[in-house]
């Protein structure tokens, strides 16, 4: 007597899992964007868009499963999607990437192996739901199209891509090259790259080791530096105690970047205190200033490669 309802239960369960997956990604979308960008397959701006397309795609699937509209189509798309993601996760596992795969954003952390098992369980649920029959009611096509539009729009409305927003790009900074060099005199062993600030183009990042947005900003800079093959020209400036610096460098994959730790007074004498603060220095002169959200990849790439003036 209860058999016909079993596929329905699994269908609804699958829908809620898709919704949960999309919502957790949306909640931690900054992390998800940087995760996608870290593969170096897309530009920073394209990573913003692609992250929201994935979230919107999962949101649409969740809504379609729950509403039972065009179930067979949703079922096929889901099966191919899970197969594709499982192949991708297997690739990550093969190359030794054990980072959080962001299947549930930063809320529930799963490495590729965990996520493969999760996908296999999901595929079993799909198979068990196969006997479900699509709902037949009026205006199916209109509702179908509406759900797609709503699902794809929500991520962009809730969290618009940073490159779609307008930011005040005025250069407001307290950085003074001479005072900064004076601060360096307090160090016995100063990295060579800090001593050549007046001679070369440098990107200097004022960050805190305990600031999550600082970590995400530096992860973006790390990818840009890798693309420009210019690690030596990225300088990290921390303040306070050194105890959390190593974990920061590990997490952001920036152990190759030169860094120093200023005293708190010296740090805030050189920065506005709005961290992360990223400065482009042309022979010691600040020509651009960025926070976390207004980083412009193409400008920094051009600056590091000295191809054009920005």
Sequence positions of predicted segments:
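Non-catalytic, surface beta->alpha helical segment in thiol-disulfide oxidoreductase systems
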Residues: 274-275, 279-310
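Structural microenvironment flanking redox-active thiols in thiol-disulfide oxidoreductases
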Residues: 217-251
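Cytosolic-side transmembrane helix boundary signature
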Residues: 120-146
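Functionalized membrane-embedded alpha-helices
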Residues: 4-26, 48-88
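Short active-site neighborhood of thiol/selenol oxidoreductases, capturing the structured segment around
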Residues: 193-215, 221, 227, 237
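Internal/C-terminal transmembrane anchor helices
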Residues: 136-163
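Short, internal strand/loop/helix patches
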Residues: 252-277
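Interfacial helix-loop-helix junctions of multi-pass membrane proteins
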Residues: 89-116
């Amino acid at each position: 007597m209860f058999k016909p309802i079993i596929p329905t239960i699994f269908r609804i369960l699958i829908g809620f899992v898709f919704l949960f997956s999309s919502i957790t990604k949306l909640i931690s979308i900054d992390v998800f964007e940087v995760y996608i960008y870290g593969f170096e397959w897309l530009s920073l701006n394209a990573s913003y868009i692609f992250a929201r397309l994935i979230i919107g795609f999962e949101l649409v699937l969740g809504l379609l499963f729950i509403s039972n509209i065009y179930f067979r189509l949703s079922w096929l798309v889901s099966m191919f999607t899970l197969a594709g993601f499982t192949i991708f996760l297997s690739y990550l596992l093969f190359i030794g990437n054990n980072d959080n795969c962001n299947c549930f954003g930063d809320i529930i952390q799963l490495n590729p192996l965990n996520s493969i098992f999760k996908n296999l369980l999901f595929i079993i649920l799909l198979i068990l739901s196969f006997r479900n029959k699509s709902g037949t009611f009026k205006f199916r096509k209109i509702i179908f199209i509406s759900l797609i539009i709503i699902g794809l729009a929500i991520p962009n409305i809730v969290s618009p891509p940073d490159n779609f927003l307008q930011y005040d790009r005025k250069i407001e900074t307290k950085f003074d090259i001479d005072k900064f060099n004076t601060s360096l005199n307090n160090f016995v062993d100063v990295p060579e790259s800090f001593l050549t600030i007046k001679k070369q183009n440098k990107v200097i990042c004022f960050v805190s080791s305990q600031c999550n947005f600082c970590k995400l900003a530096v992860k973006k800079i790390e990818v840009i530096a890798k693309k420009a093959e210019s690690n030596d020209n990225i300088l990290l400036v921390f303040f306070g105690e050194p105890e959390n610096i190593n974990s920061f460098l590990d997490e952001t994959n920036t152990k190759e970047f030169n860094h120093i730790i200023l005293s708190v007074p010296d740090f805030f004498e050189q920065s506005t205190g709005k961290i992360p603060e990223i400065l482009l220095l042309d022979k010691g002169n600040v020509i651009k200033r960025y926070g976390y959200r207004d980083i412009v990849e193409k400008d920094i790439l051009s600056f590091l490669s000295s191809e054009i003036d920005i």
